A protein has these predicted regions:
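C-terminal alpha-helical interaction appendages
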Residues: 1-70
């Protein structure tokens, strides 16, 4: 299945929101700090690459990728 640019963007935005929520809950970070952690990560850069297909994975899996960076 091929996604349109709009569909891809929607999936990335939803995954990003889930990641920020997971960072806040699991790492007890404030929202600004969680945003900073997610948006400055290699995982987020990979999420923006359609070829990585991270947007198809579960938020828990992508969060584990984010945790593995540290």
């Amino acid at each position: 299945m091929t996604l349109t640019e709009g569909q891809f963007q929607y999936m990335v935005e939803e995954m990003t929101a889930d990641l920020i929520r997971l960072v806040m809950e699991n790492e007890n970070l404030s929202m600004p700090n969680a945003f900073d952690k997610v948006y400055n990560s290699c995982t987020y850069k990979n999420l923006l690459n359609p070829l990585s297909q991270l947007y198809y994975q579960s938020p828990g899996y992508v969060y584990s990728c984010l945790c593995a960076e540290a």
